[in-house]
Amino acid sequence: MARTASGATRPSDLISWSRNGFIAYACPVQHSKDNLLLTYLENVNGNSWKLAEPQSISVKLENNFLSELALVEWSYLSTDLAISDVYGNFYILLAGIGLLEPGSEKSTVNSDSSGAASTAAASQNSPSYELTSYNHMEMIYRDIINQDPALPVNPGAAIVSFSWLNIEKVQIINKPAALVTLENQNSSNSPFVYTYGVNQFQPHGVTHPISTKQACVALRQNGQFTLYFQGEHKVEYHKTSVALSDDIVIITKASIGFTNDKQIVVTAYDSVTRNISTYSVTVDWGFLVESAKRQKVDPHYHTPKEEHKTPKLNVTRISASIPVPTFLAAAEEEGMDMDKMDVDADSEDGNQPSYQIGSLASIDIISAGAEKDSSLDILISYTFEDGSGIASSTIYRYSLSEESELISSAFGELGVRKNVTAPANSPTVQTVTLQDKLIRSGTIQSITTALSDYFILLYYLDGHVDVVDRNSMKIVNNSDDTNLPPKTISSIFDVGFNFPKIDNSSNLIMAVSPNLTSVAYADFKGGSTRLNLKVFEKEKYLGISPKELFATSVGFAFRHAYACYTNTCSDDLVALIQTEIVRLQISLQKTITDKPHNIEMIIKKFVESIVSESHKAINFQLDAFNKESVDKLLSNPPLQKLLSLQLVLGELQDKNSIVSDIAWIVLNLRSTSFGIMFSLSSIYRQISKKKPTEDSLQDSITRGECIMSLVGNVKWLIDLMVYINQELLQLSYSKQDSSNSKLTIKNSIALPIILSKVPRLFLMYALSSIGRTHEILKKLHKDLSEASKLFTPMKESLNRYFTICNNSPLTLSLFENFLRECDALITKEQSIRLAGKEKGYSLKVEQKLVCQGELTEDMEQIGKILIDRHAVNINRDMKVSDLYFYDVDWLDIGVNKRSARTSKGLSETVIYPSSQLKPKMIPRLQYSDKECIDSLRKIIISVDMNQITGKTDTSRNGTTNHKAAIANDKIAKLRKCTRCRSVSLVADPLVFDAPSTIGLWTMVFQRTCICGNAWVNCVS
C-alpha cells in the first residue's frame, strides 16, 4: 500500500469503534496489502476475551490502487462507515447487509470472493440487499475526486473535517446514580443505596428529516463543504455542495459542529491567509421534509419525481480572526487584542517563563448536547514550549452568542454608560465569544467527545488521556476526591478507575470504547497489523470492604444501563467487570489465607450485587409481570441484555452453573416462544386467505419450510420439559436420603425455573403455543387431505413435526395443567408468606431465584410441596421409566452438563494481549469433534472447528445452502456469537428449495444472537 505523509490527519481520525462493538482502523503497517482492517472483542472460553484476528477490507480505486487512508468513522447508527483517503476520495460502506446478485435471489454473502469491499454503488441498476452479520460490508457510495494518483492531483480535495449528523430519534440517557443514605442503617446490608433515573430528549442538533435515514458532512481543504445524504428510500447516498468562501486558499485545520437550532457551524484555519473563520451552514432539505411527514402515515410513500426539490446548503460567515502569535512574551498576553482569540492569563504559580514559542494545534467544535439549553463550544488549542523546552497546551473555549447589530462597539459601550439598551426588535448578529480557557501540561494531539457528548477527551502525544466534564470543565479521571461513597456516579472514574498505562505511546492510533471503559490502540511503527485492547484499571478504592464493592457494582450497573438505553455493545464492560473480579480474588487470597470458602462467598456476593443493581438501574422488576404481559416480555430488549450479562458472569463460577444455566434457558424460552408464535401467525394468515381446495404447490413449499424451521426448537422445548420432570422426579426419590444423589434442592434448575415468575410465564406460554400449533396443524392436515391438496412438502414437514411431538415420554397437556396448578399454588402461598414483609421483599425473592438460582426458606417449603404434587401426578399419568431414561444430554444444562467438564472457572488472564498466543474459541453446545448444535435453530450442524475459531468474513463470505452442504459432505458456512460463543448457520437450511425471501422467523436474528450480541460470519 502506498503511503504519503499527511499532516492534516490526526491519529484519532484513523480508528473508529462502533456501538455494535466493531473497530475499524487504517492499517498501521506501511506497504501492506490492506489499507483498512476490522476487529472486535470476542469471548474465548467463557472466562477470557481476545481481539479477533484483523479482517481485511480493501478500499480500492478502479485501477486497484490502494491509497493511504485519512478518515475512518462509523455513523451514529453504527451501520455506515465513512472512509476517505489522502487524495480526497470518499467512500461509504454499509455493514450488516449482503448484496443480492442482479436477476436472482442469490446473495453475495454466500460466495467465495475476496475480502475486498464490493462496489454496489458502481452498478447501473439499483441493487437489492439482505440483512446479514455486521462484519460483512458492501460499498454503497463513492465520491472519487482523484482517480489516478500518478496523474496531477487536486491539492485542495483532501477532507480536513468530517462529521455524521445525528438521527431524528428520541434519545433516552440515564441520569447519574444518586446517593441516598438510609435512615435506619440496620434495614439493609448496606448503609446507603443509589437511585437511578432517565432523561428523555427530543432529537437534537441537525438531523436527516427521515428518522431511518442518515447523512454526513465533509469539509475539503479548498473550502468546499459537502452534505452526503440518503434519499427517502433505499440506502444509496447523494450529495450537494457549497463553497464556504471565495477567499479560502488552503484549510489545514477545521472542525464541524451542530447547534440545537439546526445550524451547522464550521470553524476553519487557512494556513495561507492565517485566518480563523467561523461559518454558519443551514440545510434546506427540500422534498425530504414533506416525505418524512408523509412516511409517518404511509411508510411506503414515494414523492412524485416532479415534486423532487433537491436539498441545498446556505452559508453565512459569523466571524474572522487571526491566531495568537507563535512567539509570545509573558507580559504581552495581558494586552492582547481580543480579535486574536486570546484572553488575559496570569500564571497559576506566578513563575511564568519570560517567553513561549507556540503554534495552533487544533480546532475542535463540541456540538450542543441533548438538553434544550445546551450550547455549542468552539475549542481553539495551542501548543507552547517555554525556554526550558517544557511543552504545555492551552485550550480557549468560545461560544456563539447573539448581539445587537450596532454601527460600532463604541456606541454599545456608550449606551451601557448612559443606561440605554437596544430595542427588543433590533436586528442581531451571531458572534464568537470567549468563555474560558484550560491550560494543561503536555502536547494535546486531538480532542473528541464521549458518552453522548457529556465528556470531552483530550488525547496527548505521550498517550495519556484527560476526561473533562462538559458542564464543569473539570478533569474527572484524575480527581483527588477520595470520599466514599461518591455522591453521584456518572462514569467509571467516579468509582476509582482510570485509563491504563500504555507503552511506546508516541506513534499511536487510539480509540476509546463507546462505553468509556477500555481503549484500543496500535503503534504505527510497531510493524504489526493487530490492535491491542486494555480495559480501565482501578487506581482508587482498592479495598475489599462491602462499601467499596457496592459502590463499584453501582458504577458497573450504571454503565450497563447506559449501554442498554443507547443500544451499545457492552462486551468491553463485561471484560472490565471480569478484570475487577480477578483483582478482587487476588487481593482476597493475600488477605484471607485460611478460609477459601469466604473468598468464594465474597466474590459470589459481588457478582450478585452487580446483576441486581443492573436490574435496578434500568428499572426492570422481575415481580412486576403477569400472564397478560408475556407478549411484551418476548420482545423486551432490557430482559435480553440482563440475561446476557448474567449468562457471562455466571460462567465464571467453576463449581456451580445454575446462574448461567437459568439465563441460558430463559433466553432460549424467549426465542423459541417467539419463533413458534411468529410461524403460527404466518401459517394462520396464509390459510385464512385461501380455501384448502385452492392450495398450490408453492403454498405447500412455503408452509412446509415454515414448519421445518420450528422442528429443532419444538424438540428443544419438549426435551426441556422432560428434563424439568426428570429433576422433579429425582428430587422426589432423594427427598428422604439425598446422600446418594448428585442433584439436590440447592443445585436444582427445575425449582428456580418453576418457582420464579418470569421463567414460569415463559414455560406456560411456550407450552400453550405448542398446543395451539398442534391443533392448527392437525386441522390443516385433515383439510388438505380431504381436498387432495396434501403435497409432498406439507406431508413431510407435518410428519416430522408430529413425530417429534409423539415420541416424547411426556404428555405436554398434562404437564401444562401441572404448571397451571403450580402457578395458582405459588401465587396463593406467596401472598400469605409475603404478608407483613418489607417493601421490595417480593422483588428480592424473585431476583434470588432468577439471578442466583437460590431458594429462600419460604420458597424452599413451596418447592417441596410442588415436588410432592408432581410425584403424585407423574405416577398416575405416565410411564416413569420412559421419562427417567430419556436422553436430554444435548441440552447441556444441569448438574451433569458436558461443558462443565471443560470449564476452568475464573481465569487470571481476562484479555489476551495481541502479542500472546491466544487459545482458540470453544463453541457453545459442541456436539462432537465435527458437529455443533445450531443455537438458534436447535439442529445439529457440521462444522469445521478451524472455521469457527479462525478468521472471519468481511464481505462476500458467509454461508452455503445447508442441504447442498450435507449432500456434498461439505462444511456449511457459519456465524458465531461474540459473547456467548453460540454457532449458527448464516442461511436457513431450506429443505424444499423455497426462495430465500420466504421470511421465516429466524430473519429477526440475522444480525444478533438470541443473547442479543452480534453474530460474525466465519470464513469458509
UniProtKB/Swiss-Prot annotation:
Please provide an example of a Pfam family that matches this protein in its UniProt record: Med16_N
Keyword NADP, does the record have it?
Answer: no
Q: Which UniProt keywords apply?
A: Activator, Nucleus, Transcription, Transcription regulation
InterPro entries xrefs:
Mediator_Med16 (IPR048338), Mediator_Med16_C (IPR048339), Mediator_Med16_N (IPR021665)
GO annotation, cellular component aspect: mediator complex
Any idea where this protein resides? Nucleus
Major localization listed first in the record, in broad terms: nucleus
Give any single GO term for biological process.
Answer: positive regulation of DNA-templated transcription
Family assignment from sequence similarity = Belongs to the Mediator complex subunit 16 family.
The record's subunit annotation is: Component of the Mediator complex.
Described function: Component of the Mediator complex, a coactivator involved in the regulated transcription of nearly all RNA polymerase II-dependent genes. Mediator functions as a bridge to convey information from gene-specific regulatory proteins to the basal RNA polymerase II transcription machinery. Mediator is recruited to promoters by direct interactions with regulatory proteins and serves as a scaffold for the assembly of a functional preinitiation complex with RNA polymerase II and the general transcription factors.
Would you tell me the protein name for this molecule? Mediator of RNA polymerase II transcription subunit 16
Organism listed in the record: Scheffersomyces stipitis (strain ATCC 58785 / CBS 6054 / NBRC 10063 / NRRL Y-11545)
